[in-house]
Amino acid sequence: MALTAAELEAIRRGLGRGPTPVELALFTAHWSEHCAYKSTRGRLSRLPSKAPWVVKGPGTDAPLVEVAPGLYVTFKIESHNHPSAVDPYNGAATGVGGIIRDILTVGAKPIALLVNLHFGPPQDAHAKWIAQGVVRGISDYGNRVGVPVVGGETWFDEDFTYTPIVLATCVGVVSAEDVPRGGVEAGDLFIVVGSGADKSGLGGSAFASKTLTEEEDLGAVQVADPLMGKRLIDLVQEARQCVKYIKDLGGGGLATAAAELAHWFGLGLEIDLDKIHMSDAEMGPAEVLISETQERLVLVTSEGQLPCLKALFEKYDVPYSVVGRFTEGGRLVFKWRGEVVGDVPVELAANAPVLEWPTRPYKAKPLPDLPQPPLDKAIDAVLSSPNVAKKAAIYERFDFDVGVRTVVKPGEGDAAVLKLLELGDVGIVVKGDANPRYTYLSPRLGAANAFVKAYRNVVVARGIPLAAVDSINLGSPARPEVYWQFVEAVEGLAEAAEALGVPIVGGKVSLYNEYLDKPIKPVVAVVVLGKIDDVGKAAKATWEAGDGIYLWGVTKAEVGGSEYLYRIFGEVAGEPPAVDYAVEKEILRLVGTWRPRKATDVGLGGLAAALAKMAVNSGVGADVDICKAPAETTRLDFLLFSESNGRFITAGEEGPGVKIGEAEGEKLRLRCGGTLLYKRKVEELRELMALRL
């Protein structure tokens, strides 16, 4: 039971009686935090979501962003944290399947996946078991349905050893004429298609709305079926002309799908639960109602279009059931073998109470006095950190070329670049970022950092940012410090979106991410999507022998929350880097003017990590004088490792900013004037920076 005494009383008042078992199942599922956003939806309206190019914003299964007249891109982010903690393979695989189906709801063809993953330290046996299972689940599902995994990020921290944060983003494309037209009316049919209902994932939404304990709840984890998922993708590409609306049958099962659709269209809905095709004949009506069996969609169509759909169901060998009909009157009615087993007002079901929790601010540990360590050892330690390391051990498990759209592949640049085959050379640029240490130290500034980092990655790759989606992952909102984190994170996201002119068109909040009474560091992930007019001119994080190396932006004494501070001193302290939105917008202008083909931003791990990444990517060394970098600090370790925002590197004959070095030879040399600070062969760097799982 996920309902409180106050909620049960509200249900009794709304019904004028006690709920039946089926009605109780409905409210338990649909009023869960996972489905109803009880603790968060009142605050999320603060996020700006409108722009002339936003056709459809938050509130339904997937948004729509116009990238050219008559052509839309959709993208959405989803978390599958609790399931991945207890069954990493299926938890991650079903997370990917669910986000793909969200994209299908607007009739789009899924063209790419990105994953933002947060695990415990890779040397920990349990964390490694989770990481390996999650990566395998994502790989198997994405490869089998033919949707490439083109990018993302992976973060390692002790907080995620038993409570991983597993985020998947799917991108799709659809022409305006292929978006289901809506206009649902009384008499229209409610059809369930896909896998047969079973008990896998039963109570999954309630499970995701409570804190994890040592007692694993494997029964609440759904089981993936990528072959059925692929059939649904193919079905939708033809069926979109025969339907009025498509909805994913995911969290909350039929309970949530029925309540949301009836509410959105201002209608009632009558469903015969026993008519749903099942793979478990022992299920009762309440179980059928809240089953979260994967690979299922709801299609809404008129009686006259049913023959069109039936032919497609047969063509793609997709099971289906016509189980309900929309009605006048505003009631949700559920039947089982002819008997009414549930009858509730739509508005009661659709409007869970809004919760507002108390908040309690905290102050993070101030930055201690830091002695300067031996720089060569410090550089090696930061570059070999699993957070800075090259993630080939993960992305090489993924098929990132399927679909022939991927232009800039994982590891090659700051963001994924995909060709829109429908528009010739026009494409999209997409990147997701998060830094849990930043959002722990300052939730507001940390959230803003995630936004500007993703924004800058897209810009440096030559994209023009259009829209963003976010994912906020926290502990229990009943903890005043955690709810304060949420409130502050929303403010940080709102400030960044408003200042940069990039609307937030969707998102996800996941709460109760705790283990044994310990909440995680907050994870606020932001995925920014941009447009590029010619994918052949996208920038990659590389250089060639003879290139000048140019740095634009000012390095400040900003090592609060940095990888350097944690790896060398074991500290999580200080303030995250400041954000200057005018500087970030100036980078957009500069990139548009200079049009670099070889570039990277400076972020995690500082200038040392950015230079090492470009050397490893290109196989060419460099000679760099870090003391030529524009800076507000003279400490050499801060010049190397500060994570100040508003900086990027370009390589070529000329570039914006200050020339700090030249690409040459087979070694990376970092110096200050005539003093050599660090020297390593590129092949040694490649080995040093290789993540091992």
Curated annotation (Swiss-Prot):
Keywords: ATP-binding, Cytoplasm, Ligase, Magnesium, Metal-binding, Nucleotide-binding, Purine biosynthesis. GO terms for biological process: 'de novo' IMP biosynthetic process. CDD domains: PurL_repeat1 (cd02203), PurL_repeat2 (cd02204). Mg(2+) 2 binds at residues 102, 248. Pfam families: AIRS (PF00586), AIRS_C (PF02769), FGAR-AT_linker (PF18072). The active site is at 34, 80 (proton acceptor). Pathway: Purine metabolism; IMP biosynthesis via de novo pathway; 5-amino-1-(5-phospho-D-ribosyl)imidazole from N(2)-formyl-N(1)-(5-phospho-D-ribosyl)glycinamide: step 1/2. InterPro entries: PRibForGlyAmidine_synth_PurL (IPR010074), PurL_linker (IPR041609), PurM-like_C_dom (IPR010918), PurM-like_C_sf (IPR036676), PurM-like_N (IPR016188), PurM-like_N_sf (IPR036921). It catalyses: N(2)-formyl-N(1)-(5-phospho-beta-D-ribosyl)glycinamide + L-glutamine + ATP + H2O = 2-formamido-N(1)-(5-O-phospho-beta-D-ribosyl)acetamidine + L-glutamate + ADP + phosphate + H(+). It is found in: Cytoplasm. It comes from the Archaea. GO terms for molecular function: ATP binding; magnesium ion binding; phosphoribosylformylglycinamidine synthase activity. Its EC number is 6.3.5.3. ATP binds at residues 37, 76, 470, 507. GO terms for cellular component: cytoplasm. It is an enzyme of class 6 (ligase). Mg(2+) 1 binds at residue 78. Substrate binds at residues 79-82, 101, 222, 292-294, 510. Monomer. Part of the FGAM synthase complex composed of 1 PurL, 1 PurQ and 2 PurS subunits. NCBIfam families: FGAM_synth_II (TIGR01736), PRK01213.1 (NF002290). Belongs to the FGAMS family. Part of the phosphoribosylformylglycinamidine synthase complex involved in the purines biosynthetic pathway. Catalyzes the ATP-dependent conversion of formylglycinamide ribonucleotide (FGAR) and glutamine to yield formylglycinamidine ribonucleotide (FGAM) and glutamate. The FGAM synthase complex is composed of three subunits. PurQ produces an ammonia molecule by converting glutamine to glutamate. PurL transfers the ammonia molecule to FGAR to form FGAM in an ATP-dependent manner. This is Phosphoribosylformylglycinamidine synthase subunit PurL. It comes from Pyrobaculum calidifontis (strain DSM 21063 / JCM 11548 / VA1). The lineage of its organism: Archaea, Thermoproteota, Thermoprotei, Thermoproteales, Thermoproteaceae.
